[in-house]
Amino acid sequence: MEVPRLSQHMSTPNSPCEEMIKNLSLENIQLCERDGNKSQDSGIAEMEELPVPHNIKISNITCDSFKISWDMDPKSKDRITHYFVDLNKKENKNSNKFKHKDVPTKLVAKAVPLPMTVRGHWFLSPRTEYTVAVQTASKQVDGDYAVSEWSEIIEFCTADYSKVHLTQLMEKAEAIAGRMLKFSVFYRNQHKEYFDYIREHHGNVMQPSPKDNSGSHGSPISAKLEGIFFSCNTEFNTGKPQQDSPYGRYRVEIPAEKLFNPNTNLYFGDFYCMYTAYHYVILVIAPMGSPGDEFCKQRLPQLSLSDNKFLTCTQEHDGLVFHQAQDVILEVIYTDPVDLSWGNVAEIIGHQLMSLSTADAKKDPSCKTCNISVGR
């Protein structure tokens, strides 16, 4: 996309950018305000009518790109030199929460054959609703533009991270995972009332529920994958489960082989931090052929059970042996129901550290360790 030089007396926010809008998110870009469907740019001429884009189509949507095409009257097509694309986050329409109110959202592109690809992680975020409208423009000899009326406004939503993006994220997580330590149980902390409710109303069986929105905004498992959250990190000096927890003073401990064995598949789900030095890796364990397994197979990178940097299960002469990464906090999601009778419920002797909870935690978008160069 080329951003042409415009007349100095043009007003914003409806003026096109003078250079590619790099390193800016839509939160820091001024929304275009239009009265009806006409351009209000004082430096843009409307000497001759140009075709108005209509029947706009959005296709090939990814987490940080999309293709756009439209129909228009072919009579003046030869005079069109540029397209103006007005792109806004739907949630920020009519918002005034901007630091840089003089920066337009309008993207300017040379008139290329349609469909045209719009790509850029500096203004597109994954799983986010946007509105888009288009003008056709003709560059004049004095550097100003003749423009069409605005098209209708179209809404669309960007996609989640693909497996390719998640693999990039996984490789960054592997770089800091550290050495592997033995462990023997998965554990889940909750309040006493939770376990009482499971016994009384669910026949002693914990049921999967939708994952919250913690972690990367583009993670395909957030609010979609159903599972049960477990931990497995151990105290460095004892090899036993950590004494403290942010989630409750009661804990169920399940022998590792009950949840993680050769009849399960293991997937990488996410890598994030919460403005702290701690980094979290989300892994998914799914019984082979289960609905959770089918969900993950389509969306997440699959890991070898015995050879990965985060969580392993290996067969030795004494049986299955389990290891977990020392330098990241593992959040393990098991996708099937779990009977409390598989393990033991008891009160912990440590503290309930609420400040360490990751419930609906937002990822630090500025962290160089756990972000990749696509929408955050």
UniProtKB/Swiss-Prot annotation:
- Put simply, this protein is called Phytanoyl-CoA hydroxylase-interacting protein-like
Function of the protein? May play a role in the development of the central system.
Chain's gene name? phyhipl
Stored InterPro entries: FN3_dom, FN3_sf, Ig-like_fold, PHYHIP/PHYHIPL, PHYIP/PHIPL_C
Gene Ontology cellular component terms for the protein in this record: cytoplasm
Fibronectin type-III domain residues are: 52-161
Protein family membership: Belongs to the PHYHIP family.
Cited SMART domains = FN3
